[in-house]
Amino acid sequence: MKAVRLAVIDYDAGNLHSACKGLERAGAEVQLVTEPAGLAAFDGLVLPGDGAFDPAMQQLRARGFGEAIRQAIERQQPFLGICIGLQVLFEDSEEGTEPGLGIVPGRVQRFRPEPGLRIPHMGWNQLHLTQPDSPLWAGIPEQSWVYFVHSYHAVPKDPSWVVATTQHGSQTCVAAIARGTLFATQFHPEKSGPVGLKILQNFVEFVARRLPAAGA
């Protein structure tokens, strides 16, 4: 079977190396890309990263990736966002003043303070699969443990975007969104052990199913 070729977008955000290694373990051929030229030639795109909303958006726009990502999603090129790569898909964030990509209507909000609640939400937590038939969740049991690091969480205007949630204190927050060929996780699958590797494999296999058959 032809290897799935994924472009991992390098926009000076953290955690790119771990994401690349995770995707390679999941069976993909991975290339870091620093400019948008040629993105359409890849089988899928991945936008990982740690960090704050405003610097992420500034770097994406400065490198020309903002419009390129929108165009890729419009042409139904498979896309996986991770952590800040999920948040920048939204319209804006309470963390800063930069506009987001606006692909998903809604905004990113800070966790409300609660007695005894630690912010950031950091460490292992369980997934509630609100759409268990999503391609991301093939072979993933309800209440699987995955790894989070974030102080802000996305709130889509249309709840049908949400394919998994998690609980932090009394607050239910988005753990993953998906629609069509767009997928994004607030947690870090590349840091989530065997469950995370399976989720990355599910994305790679989703991309592979869309490739032309050999000899076609």
Curated annotation (Swiss-Prot):
Keywords: Amino-acid biosynthesis, Cytoplasm, Glutamine amidotransferase, Histidine biosynthesis, Hydrolase, Lyase
Active site: residue positions: 83 (nucleophile), 188, 190
Catalysed reactions, as listed in the record: 5-[(5-phospho-1-deoxy-D-ribulos-1-ylimino)methylamino]-1-(5-phospho-beta-D-ribosyl)imidazole-4-carboxamide + L-glutamine = D-erythro-1-(imidazol-4-yl)glycerol 3-phosphate + 5-amino-1-(5-phospho-beta-D-ribosyl)imidazole-4-carboxamide + L-glutamate + H(+); L-glutamine + H2O = L-glutamate + NH4(+)
Pathway: Amino-acid biosynthesis; L-histidine biosynthesis; L-histidine from 5-phospho-alpha-D-ribose 1-diphosphate: step 5/9
Organism whose genome encodes this protein: Synechococcus sp. (strain JA-3-3Ab)
Protein name: Imidazole glycerol phosphate synthase subunit HisH
Residue ranges occupied by any Glutamine amidotransferase type-1 domain in the UniProt entry: 5-213
Gene Ontology process terms (BP): L-histidine biosynthetic process
